[in-house]
Amino acid sequence: MKSLQFCFLFCCWKAICCNSCELTNITITVEKEECNFCISINTTWCAGYCYTRDLVYKDPARPNIQKTCTFKELVYETVKVPGCAHHADSLYTYPVATECHCGKCDSDSTDCTVRGLGPSYCSFSEMKE
């Protein structure tokens, strides 16, 4: 019985104390207006859960900052979008996460909305792989 209680407490501790915010492979759609179509590329980004809470009593002296799984460090990679006009810039630079953590969402560099456009959004009807 004690081992069962220990196992239960260990699982609770693991769920509360250990975040599962980690690097994951995703496919994003990139587009250039000058090229009139989208391409899909594979990249790395952060995904997972972070410990957070929403207080019932809102204390103005203590700001309520919700933590989200976001990048700690990233690099930029560039891909050439095929089929662009000769006068157009066919290079597209996109971020690749190299390290993740649970922290405040930085709206200067990240879409912090509840429902953004999503990684597969394309404003053109033609999509190339």
Swiss-Prot record:
GO terms for biological process: follicle-stimulating hormone signaling pathway; G protein-coupled receptor signaling pathway; positive regulation of bone resorption; positive regulation of gene expression; positive regulation of steroid biosynthetic process; regulation of osteoclast differentiation; regulation of signaling receptor activity; Sertoli cell proliferation. It comes from Sus scrofa (Pig). Coiled coil: none annotated. The keyword Glycoprotein applies. SUPFAM superfamilies: Cystine-knot cytokines. Belongs to the glycoprotein hormones subunit beta family. InterPro entries: Cystine-knot_cytokine (IPR029034), Glyco_hormone_CN (IPR006208), Gonadotropin_bsu (IPR001545), Gonadotropin_bsu_CS (IPR018245). GO terms for molecular function: follicle-stimulating hormone activity. The lineage of its organism: Eukaryota, Metazoa, Chordata, Craniata, Vertebrata. Glycans are attached at residues 25, 42. This is Follitropin subunit beta. Keywords: Disulfide bond, Glycoprotein, Hormone, Secreted, Signal. Residues 1-20 form the signal peptide. Pfam families: Cys_knot (PF00007). One of its GO terms (cellular component) is cytoplasm. It is found in: Secreted.
